[in-house]
């Protein structure tokens, strides 16, 4: 009977600690996602400029 009470208390403490863990302050994957979005936005913004440079190079024959 005592073993059952001890195991129940240990299990209850384990469940409490797992559910009471706060969120981490530094969200690693959010930072990676933001870097990826910035790279994607930079590529989208640079697309027209690269196309113009390509057309200019083809006009001059280089």
UniProtKB/Swiss-Prot annotation:
Any one of the GO CC terms: extracellular region
Record organism: Trichoplusia ni (Cabbage looper)
Source species, domain of life: Eukaryota
Biological process per Gene Ontology, one example term: antibacterial humoral response
Residues spanning the signal sequence: 1-20
Name of this protein: Cecropin-A
Keywords of this entry: Amidation, Antibiotic, Antimicrobial, Immunity, Innate immunity, Secreted, Signal
Functional note: Has antibacterial activity.
Keyword Secreted: yes
Residue stretch(es) of the prosequence: 21-24
Keyword Signal attributed: yes
Threonine amide PTM sites in chain numbering: 60
Main location, first listed in the record: secreted
Any Pfam family matching the protein: Cecropin
InterPro entries in the record: Cecropin
Stated family: Belongs to the cecropin family.
Location in or out of the cell: Secreted
